[in-house]
């Protein structure tokens, strides 16, 4: 009986460690993927960059994307 309880306890510990490790290594967002203000969800070589959208001078919201660090994007007119 003690061996059965010990085995069950060991299995529970192993499963919880595996789940914790998987959560720590969650997938990051690739370049040009939509992100939030949190910088932690983009991959390490990227940063979550946000800009305000507008149409005919009327604000339409905010968009955020994972972009390369230290790169400036401009719109050609």
Swiss-Prot record:
Post-translational modification: Contains 4 disulfide bonds.
Residue ranges of the propeptide: 21-26
Signal sequence residues: 1-20
Source taxon at top rank: Eukaryota
Tissue: Expressed by the venom gland.
Keywords carried by this UniProt record: Disulfide bond, Secreted, Signal, Toxin
Compartments, as annotated in UniProt: Secreted
Family note: Belongs to the neurotoxin 19 (CSTX) family. 08 (U8-Lctx) subfamily.
Protein's name in the database: U9-lycotoxin-Ls1a
Classification lineage: Eukaryota, Metazoa, Ecdysozoa, Arthropoda, Chelicerata
